[in-house]
UniProtKB/Swiss-Prot annotation:
Domain called FAD-binding PCMH-type: residue spans: 23-188
Record InterPro entries: FAD-bd_PCMH, FAD-bd_PCMH-like_sf, FAD-bd_PCMH_sub1, FAD-bd_PCMH_sub2, MurB, MurB_C, MurB_C_sf, Oxid_FAD_bind_N
GO molecular function, one term: UDP-N-acetylmuramate dehydrogenase activity
Organism encoding this protein: Rickettsia bellii (strain RML369-C)
Organism lineage string: Bacteria, Pseudomonadati, Pseudomonadota, Alphaproteobacteria, Rickettsiales
Active site: R168, S217, E287
The protein, known as: UDP-N-acetylenolpyruvoylglucosamine reductase
Keywords: Cell cycle, Cell division, Cell shape, Cell wall biogenesis/degradation, Cytoplasm, FAD, Flavoprotein, NADP, Oxidoreductase, Peptidoglycan synthesis
Catalytic activity: UDP-N-acetyl-alpha-D-muramate + NADP(+) = UDP-N-acetyl-3-O-(1-carboxyvinyl)-alpha-D-glucosamine + NADPH + H(+)
Listed EC numbers: 1.3.1.98
Subcellular location(s) of the protein: Cytoplasm
Length: 302
């Protein structure tokens, strides 16, 4: 395989399991960490959209299937995590910046509206992509625009309106890598902001299995319902397939209890979908992304 000439690092047959919160999954055929945006653009231009591309963030809301990922898996590293101010007073944040890091930066700098990010695992890029939200706020409420690059190597900008935010999603082109996000700045009081962040952390600790190997919310909430309530009603609290189980603490969280496979987790989620539909007539939609190839040792649907 002839790979584009880059300044960054390639790794072949790279184990992705240790990068995910679930600690499951196969290897990346090729793993690439670009040095900067220009290095990424050079790779994409040289690639000419020949090799399949998968982007990878913090690994917090994802199941990588046991057969791994074909083509090139791109992970943006520390060089894409800067936080700064624009000339017009907005915040500009690299897409690999952790949500928690941005929340803490805003608290220290007395910027309000970002408190909810302390309760959302993952990166800014992933948060924008899925319009992540919690405690009454979503990314669409604070975002001005994004800077991105398409798989052909063209730099592009999208405003909040052009992104087309919807519940846990957007209408952006699929062949896009988010590089930076620009946010509104509203001044607040650091002590008040910290108090709200502490409230959110306390609520998470008491209601979510945050110390377990989990991937966050498994299913998006159907309109007018809470997924966890539907799962609980179907009698699935604590239900287990192999080493994968539904959390006893919060039914919309799956847990790897030690040696679960990606297949066991995905099979568990699909089983929950089926049983909730049989019980309530409501189809739950996955919020966790499932990517990669199914292992030849077993088939997984969905």
């Amino acid at each position: 395989m002839n790979l584009p000439i880059v300044k960054g690092e390639y790794r072949k047959d790279y184990n992705l399991k240790h990068l995910t919160w679930f600690k499951v999954g196969g290897n990346a055929e090729i793993f690439f960490k670009p040095v900067d945006s220009e290095d990424l653009a050079s790779f994409l231009v040289q690639n000419k959209q020949k090799l399949p591309i998968t982007t990878f963030g913090a690994g917090s809301n994802i199941i990588i299937r046991d057969g791994g990922i074909e083509g090139v898996t791109i992970k943006l590293g520390q060089n894409f995590s800067n936080i700064d101010f624009t000339d017009d007073g907005h915040l500009i944040v690299g897409s690999s910046c952790l949500n928690f890091s941005l929340a803490k930066f805003c608290q220290v700098n007395a910027i309000s509206g970002f408190e909810f990010l302390v309760g959302i695992p993952g990166t800014i890029g992933g948060g924008v992509a899925m319009n992540a939200g919690a405690y009454g706020c979503e990314f669409k409420d604070i975002l001005v625009r994004i800077e991105a690059i398409d798989f052909a190597g063209n730099f592009r900008t999208f405003t909040n309106e052009e992104i087309g935010f919807k519940y846990r999603g957007n209408n952006l082109p699929k062949d896009l890598i988010i590089l930076k996000a620009v946010f509104k700045v509203n001044k607040g009081n650091s002590e008040d902001i910290l108090a709200r962040m502490n409230e959110i952390n306390a609520a998470r600790s008491s209601t979510q299995p945050i110390k377990e190997r989990t991937g966050g919310s498994t299913f998006a909430n159907p309109e007018g319902f809470k997924s966890w309530q539907l799962i609980d009603k179907a009698g699935l609290r604590g239900y287990r397939i192999g080493d994968a189980s539904i959390s006893e603490l919060h039914c919309n969280f799956m847990i790897n209890n030690g040696n679960a496979t990606a297949k066991e987790l995905e099979d568990l989620g699909n089983f929950v979908q089926q049983k909730v539909f049989e019980d309530s007539g409501i189809k739950l939609n996955w919020e966790i992304k499932r990517i990669g190839k199914v292992s030849s040792r077993g088939l997984t649907t969905g």
